[in-house]
UniProtKB/Swiss-Prot annotation:
Gene name of this polypeptide: cysS
Keywords on record: Aminoacyl-tRNA synthetase, ATP-binding, Cytoplasm, Ligase, Metal-binding, Nucleotide-binding, Protein biosynthesis, Zinc
Cofactor: Zn(2+)
Entry binding sites for ATP: K274
A matching Pfam family: DALR_2
Subcellular location: Cytoplasm
Protein name: Cysteine--tRNA ligase
EC number: 6.1.1.16
Length: 463
C-alpha cells in the first residue's frame, strides 16, 4: 500500500505515518467512564477509531489496539451512592451495556480493554517517579498534584503557553495548589466515601486522578513510547496535555508520535447536552435507526470535522446505505473477497483512506462502484464493492436481510408485509387491479417498496 498520512494534532499538520517498529502499530484511545449509557458522542469515538484500526490491519500492520475503561471516578462514586449499590455493580452493568452498543455498531473489540481499578499499582509507581523527578508534590489537603510549571513542554499539544491556558481556562481556586493549572495525581480519601473507592499509598489512602490512569495503562500495555493516541477533541486539553506531562515527566522519553482527535457531535447544529434536552444515548438512537445506518452516518463525515446529528441526516444516511445494498441485491458478490487495489475504484479508495482516513471520499467511491454494478450486473464489481466497504465495516450483511430489516417507526413488520403481498396477489388474480394498486400505495406510504419479478414473484424492501 502507499504511504499513509495522518493529521497529527501535536504537529498541526498531516504527516507520513512511520511506525516506531516496522510493521507494527501500537495505538491507545481514551474510552468511556462507565456510570451511564453511552451517548452518540461515544458512538463516534468507537466507530472512528474502529475504522482506523481496521484500515491499519488492512494495510498489513500488526496492530495492538488499547481502549481503556474508567471505572473509578467522582461521578461513579456519586451515582453508586445514589443508587445504593456498589461501584463494581454499577460499572459492571454499564460495561456490559457499552459492549452491547459497540457490538451493534460493528465495532471490533480492542486487543486490550484495561480497567483503571486493575492498574492502581502502576499508577502509584508513576506518581512516585514524578515526585522523585521533582514534578509532583503533596499539598496541604492531602492530594498529590502535578507541578505544571516544572515541566517545560506543558502546553505543546494545545499550542498555548501557561499564561494563555490560565487566562482561557476556568480553573477552580484551590489554595492547596502551587499553580491553578496544577492537576491531581492522587486524591486523598474523604471520610464519607465508600471503602472500595480507596487504596493504600505512600501518601495515605485515596484514589488515582483521571489523567494518571491513561498514562499508566498505556505505558504498561504499549511501552513508554508508542505510535498513535486518539480520542475526542474535547480531551485535547486538559486530559491529553496532562498525559504528555505525566508520561514524559516520568520517563524522560517522547510519549506518543502522533495524536488524533475526532470532532465534536452537535445535535441540530447545537451542542449536545442534557440541559438542552437534545442528549441521545446510543440505545435511544438504535430504537429508531438500524445500527449500520448509524455507523454509515458517522463514516460519511471526515473524522476531524464536527458531526451534526439530526433525524434528517440519519434518514438520508438510511436511504444512501439502502442504495448500496440494493446494488448488491441481485448481483452475487463473492463471499470473503479481498479488495483489488489495482482496479480503478480500489486505487481511489486507497488514496482516500491513506489521506488522513478520508472516509467521505472513500464512500463516494463506493457509490460510483454501486452505479457500475447497477449498469453492468458484474459479479466482479459487486465483489469489489462488498470488499472495499467491508474494510471499513460496512455492507457485511445479506442485502435482502438489510433491505427488509431495520427499525421502522410505523411498526410495520415482515409478517405483516408478507400478508399484504399475499392479499395483493389474490387481488390481482381476481383482476381487482384497483385493490392491488391501493395495497402497493399503502405499503409505500409505510416505507415499503414492492418489486414485481418474473414468474409472479414479488420482493420487497424498506424505502
Amino acid at each position: 500500500m502507499e504511504s499513509l498520512k495522518i493529521y497529527n494534532t501535536l504537529a498541526r499538520e498531516k504527516q507520513t505515518f512511520v511506525p516506531i517498529e516496522p510493521g507494527r502499530v501500537r495505538m491507545y484511545v481514551c474510552g468511556m467512564t462507565v456510570y451511564d449509557y453511552c451517548h452518540v458522542g461515544h458512538a463516534r469515538v468507537m466507530v472512528v477509531f474502529d475504522m482506523v484500526q481496521r484500515w491499519l490491519r488492512a494495510a498489513g500492520y500488526d496492530v495492538t489496539y488499547v481502549r481503556n475503561i474508567t471505572d473509578i471516578d467522582d461521578k461513579i462514586i456519586k451515582r453508586a451512592v445514589e443508587n445504593g449499590e456498589t461501584m463494581s455493580a454499577l460499572t459492571g452493568r454499564f460495561i456490559a451495556a457499552m459492549h452491547e452498543d459497540a457490538d451493534a455498531l460493528g465495532v471490533q473489540r480492542p486487543d486490550h480493554e484495561p480497567r483503571a481499578t486493575e492498574y492502581v499499582p502502576q499508577m502509584l509507581s508513576m506518581i512516585g517517579r514524578l515526585q522523585t523527578n521533582g514534578l509532583a508534590y503533596q499539598a496541604t489537603d492531602g492530594d498529590v498534584n502535578y507541578a505544571v510549571r516544572k515541566f517545560p513542554g506543558y502546553g505543546k499539544l494545545s499550542g498555548k503557553s501557561l499564561e494563555d491556558l490560565r487566562a482561557g481556562e476556568r480553573v477552580a481556586a484551590n489554595d492547596a495548589k502551587q499553580d491553578p493549572l496544577d492537576f491531581v495525581l492522587w486524591k486523598s480519601a474523604k471520610a464519607d466515601e465508600p471503602a472500595e473507592s480507596r487504596w493504600a499509598s505512600p501518601w495515605g489512602e485515596g484514589r488515582p486522578g483521571w489523567h494518571i490512569e491513561c498514562s499508566a495503562m498505556s505505558c504498561e500495555l504499549l511501552g513508554e513510547h508508542f505510535d498513535l493516541h486518539g480520542g475526542g477533541a474535547d480531551l485535547q486539553f486538559p486530559h491529553h496535555e496532562n498525559e504528555i506531562a505525566q508520561s514524559e515527566g516520568a520517563t524522560g522519553k517522547t510519549f506518543v508520535n502522533m495524536w488524533m482527535h475526532n470532532g465534536f457531535v452537535r445535535v441540530n447544529d447545537e451542542k449536545m447536552s442534557k440541559s438542552l434536552g437534545n442528549f441521545f444515548t446510543i440505545r435511544d438512537v438504535l430504537k429508531v435507526y438500524d445500527a449500520e445506518v448509524v455507523r454509515f452516518f458517522i463514516l460519511r463525515s471526515h473524522y476531524r470535522s464536527d458531526l451534526n446529528y439530526s433525524d434528517a441526516h440519519l434518514d438520508d444516511a438510511r436511504h444512501a446505505l439502502t442504495r448500496l445494498y440494493t446494488a448488491l441485491k441481485d448481483v452475487p458478490a463473492a463471499v470473503g473477497a479481498k479488495p483489488d487495489w489495482s482496479e480503478s475504484h480500489g486505487k481511489r479508495f486507497l488514496e482516500a483512506m491513506n489521506d488522513d482516513f478520508n472516509t467521505p471520499v472513500a464512500v463516494s467511491v463506493l457509490f460510483e462502484l454501486a452505479s457500475e454494478v447497477n449498469k453492468t450486473r458484474s459479479p466482479e464489481l459487486a465483489s469489489q464493492l462488498a470488499a472495499l466497504a467491508g474494510v471499513i465495516g460496512l455492507l457485511g450483511r445479506d442485502p435482502h436481510v438489510f433491505l427488509q430489516g431495520g427499525v421502522s417507526a410505523d411498526g410495520v413488520d415482515a409478517a405483516e408485509v408478507e400478508a399484504r403481498i399475499e392479499e395483493r396477489r389474490a387481488a390481482k388474480a381476481a383482476r381487482d387491479f384497483a385493490r392491488a394498486d391501493a395495497i402497493r400505495a399503502d405499503l409505500l406510504a409505510a416505507g415499503i417498496v414492492l418489486e414485481d419479478k418474473p414468474g409472479g414473484l414479488t420482493e420487497w424492501r424498506r424505502a
